């Protein structure tokens, strides 16, 4: 990330990057190293909790919520931080030098990565299990987790994880550009609205909702089970996209945006966090870490890839760049995404029947 920042800094504010390929390579490399840490942190947390005799369903969510708190803090910071002519400031007013629009966001990401790197040395040790028998190459690479696909329940779980990963990628990739696109509206009230000029701050409501919903997971999992909890997530995605489709940044349309951000907490947590707990409970100790990696691969790997490609085709068909904003028939796009989430939810309800445990 610091490399991406340096390339942007060298090019100068508002200038085109001279070497786009190097920028993409550095960014992709950074993301490639980051993505496995999601599964790794889940596995580490579950291991430490169990080593200390704690309940993962009850005690993991309050820990996980701190990650969301950090997410919110950085969203607010990047939304408001400005670096202009060597002077740092914070503002809610529209400013082209805000970190959210410039290479400075990569600088923040790089510095935080170094801080987290150092923090990892303070974590409790998670000892590896030593096996008396010779470990195969498949086991060493963690590929033995793929045997979970032999079980119908886990195979369906991972398939639907990928489908929900597509939904997550849609909102990750297009929520911000969609809201910001209203700055190019012919309606002055919409173009100058607070929401259109502070998309990152507005969407942080999603993370606030996420933080609150994480704390509800223990109750819902124990009361209703994984199937109902995941169904709540799937239908929350329907509302997430649907509210975007009917809203706009000005009053009263912005209320729809706020509602979309609120239901995001259920859409994300009741699948991603609950799914991680479900995988930990269902898998044997020897493959728990690999299974978490497989879960992340299905959601943030396969699901995200197909989600990016499919959503890109849809958005490119209905929208186009005009005056620096991605404008067009966004309503149709969001309704298509909502329909997809609805089909996934109904299909999941019909085919996924997890075993009930006493």
Language-model regions, residue ranges each:
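Short amphipathic helix-loop junctions that connect adjacent transmembrane helices
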Residues: 173-197
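Multi-pass alpha-helical transporter architecture, strongest
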Residues: 8-11, 112-125, 332-358
């Amino acid at each position: 990330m610091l490399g991406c920042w340096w390339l942007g800094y060298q090019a100068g504010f508002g200038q085109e990057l001279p070497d786009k390929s190097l920028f993409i390579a550095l960014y992709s490399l950074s993301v490639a190293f980051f993505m496995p840490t999601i599964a790794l942190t889940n596995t580490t947390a579950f291991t430490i909790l169990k080593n200390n005799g704690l309940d993962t369903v009850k005690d993991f969510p309050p820990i996980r919520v701190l990650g969301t708190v950090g997410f919110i803090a950085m969203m607010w910071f990047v939304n408001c931080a400005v670096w202009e002519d060597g002077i740092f400031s914070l503002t809610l007013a529209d400013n082209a030098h805000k970190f959210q629009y410039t290479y400075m966001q990569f600088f923040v990401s790089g510095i935080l990565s170094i801080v987290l790197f150092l923090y990892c040395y303070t974590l409790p040790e998670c000892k590896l299990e030593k096996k008396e028998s010779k470990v195969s190459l498949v086991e060493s690479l963690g590929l033995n987790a793929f045997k979970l696909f032999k079980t119908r329940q886990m195979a369906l779980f991972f398939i639907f994880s990928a489908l929900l990963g597509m939904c997550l990628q849609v909102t990750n990739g297009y929520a911000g550009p969609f809201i910001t696109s209203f700055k190019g509206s012919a309606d002055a009230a919409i173009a100058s609205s607070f929401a259109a000029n502070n998309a990152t701050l507005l969407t942080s409501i999603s993370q606030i909702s996420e933080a609150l919903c994480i704390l509800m997971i223990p109750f819902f999992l124990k009361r209703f089970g994984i199937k109902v909890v995941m169904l709540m997530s799937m239908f929350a995605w329907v509302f997430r996209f649907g509210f975007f489709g009917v809203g706009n940044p000005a009053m009263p349309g912005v209320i729809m945006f706020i509602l979309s951000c609120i239901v995001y907490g259920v859409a994300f947590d009741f699948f991603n966090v609950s799914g991680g707990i479900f995988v930990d409970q269902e898998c044997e100790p020897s493959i728990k870490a690999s299974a978490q990696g497989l879960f992340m691969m299905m959601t943030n790997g396969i699901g995200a890839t197909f989600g990016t490609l499919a959503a890109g085709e849809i958005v490119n068909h209905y929208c186009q760049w005009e005056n620096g904003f991605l404008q067009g028939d966004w309503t149709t796009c969001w309704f298509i995404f909502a329909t997809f989430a609805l089909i996934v939810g109904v299909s999941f309800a019909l085919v996924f029947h997890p075993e009930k445990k006493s």
